[in-house]
């Protein structure tokens, strides 16, 4: 990787587009002065924004295209209309051509995953992409995947997710051997689905040097911080993330209306507002923006479509770190080197009788 | 149903047993003076508790047994050791024999579901039991099922869950035609699993008089109150519930430690503590205790194993209401009467050309 981190941005992605992406990039640049940007999209919209951020302008190149994938496009429509021409595709292609180290888009998730898969192709041994997000816990943070890039999957898929999530966590949290748990339920006698039990057995017998498999984790174990990486197929991962987000939002609403209902509570709130700010800071989805699309020959980060400039900057931060600390190499090592996750299981030595 | 509501209690169930169950029953009796109780378990433990609650004692009968299912017993162990003899089994059997209108147990979930299935048998047309819980939402409350009585399931299973959940919601919320949504994710082009889409089509074409099918609901739609009933198979239902519970607990922890860190915030908290009490009241799991085991020839309510007397009383309240308002008849109507959920789909009339 060259000295600079070269970041390709889909400047048209998200609910707002350039008016969020460009100021967001400017914020990220202030935190990472060694970043450079390729900005793909409608130059008539990008350039006026860029003119307001001269430092960003100095390290950016604008590549014009009229075509943008809309937030409503289905993946197949996006591919049909936007392949080779859209700002989303061109940002991904820059990574493919080696002109950028990472692509960041706030465009629609389904389209981005489909295009990334089509443009960058899957890593050797990986069948399907996955979306990984950073989740706040009581103890610190954890990585949860897959959040819905695809749904379902056998034990090998779960093991691949564990390996990729482990590599991501080792980069993000600077842990050489992050703990990994499989999301499961504790009610049934024989716990959970067959494929989860199988994946657990595989991970245990592999005993990978790059990750520490700790067993099953239930839904409430995510927030408790029971593991650095929580692995599950995309359906339940998506449900878990959204149910938790919904519960938090609902609680904030309830608290707000309870406080509004009493003037004493309002005074109390004013006095305690420092504490509330700490809380909001810790749980604000904006601070956890930036899901990583894993499993590809290239690094792609998905920003929330509705995020503001500060939120988008966080997604750029994630992309920067993934590129700077060479996520792809780490993933490949975990998957393939020294009896990695995709190597055949070691044969037990026969005991001498 | 006779004038009185007769409630069979597994007095040994839960982490504590009689010392929670008996005071809990006393609290529930104060709210429902027309209840009567059958108390199954070790009379040496039950009677001393009962002596402290003379009003409860006056409407209770103690049926002694030495055998209790432990919280650690696997379902198969519980059945082997506790069938026909344990306090859990005897409470269920009282319902089967028509001596009680409902059974309530805080015993272990897997054992209770297995025993209930074995003792009471499934309703006609229902293959598997389901666990339904009441969930607080921004707007009011909703019913979520299945929370893990079994995992997986085809479209017919989901339709049966919708019908049973609808009947439960109509009793709980006094709505003649509660809204029902299928839990799903919104990322993939063709949303979610095949069986969910199929179930959606079936529910739409059935257009049942007892429930209003509104389509798919995402994970964050549960807390928003998008439907009175949220239907999903047991794995994702369990994950959703626990992830949301975990997020709420985590948030309360964060808030608590943020407030503790500043004396100004502590004063603010004192002033606002009425508002916090309102919040706690609204989200306290204790106030939502009591999951209903659905699909059986009889009403069974599961209390959380770790709940206190007030929590257990809530579970008894749920059981009381289910019996008083004749949940079973409502379920059977929704399932079978007038082209109910289990009737064959109506054949479209041919248009006269």
Curated annotation (Swiss-Prot), chains A, B:
EC number: 2.3.1.274
Chemical reaction(s) catalysed: a fatty acyl-[ACP] + phosphate = an acyl phosphate + holo-[ACP]
Pathway(s) where this gene product acts: Lipid metabolism; phospholipid metabolism
Keyword Oxidoreductase on entry: no
GO cellular component: cytoplasm
Keywords: Cytoplasm, Lipid biosynthesis, Lipid metabolism, Phospholipid biosynthesis, Phospholipid metabolism, Transferase
Pfam families: FA_synthesis (PF02504)
UniProt keyword annotation of Zinc-finger present: no
UniProt-listed SUPFAM superfamilies: Isocitrate/Isopropylmalate dehydrogenase-like
Subcellular location: Cytoplasm
Any one GO BP annotation for this protein: phospholipid biosynthetic process
GO MF terms, alphabetically ordered: phosphate:acyl-[acyl carrier protein] acyltransferase activity
Subunit structure: Homodimer. Probably interacts with PlsY.
Its biological purpose: Catalyzes the reversible formation of acyl-phosphate (acyl-PO(4)) from acyl-[acyl-carrier-protein] (acyl-ACP). This enzyme utilizes acyl-ACP as fatty acyl donor, but not acyl-CoA.
Family: Belongs to the PlsX family.
Protein name: Phosphate acyltransferase
Gene that produces this protein: plsX
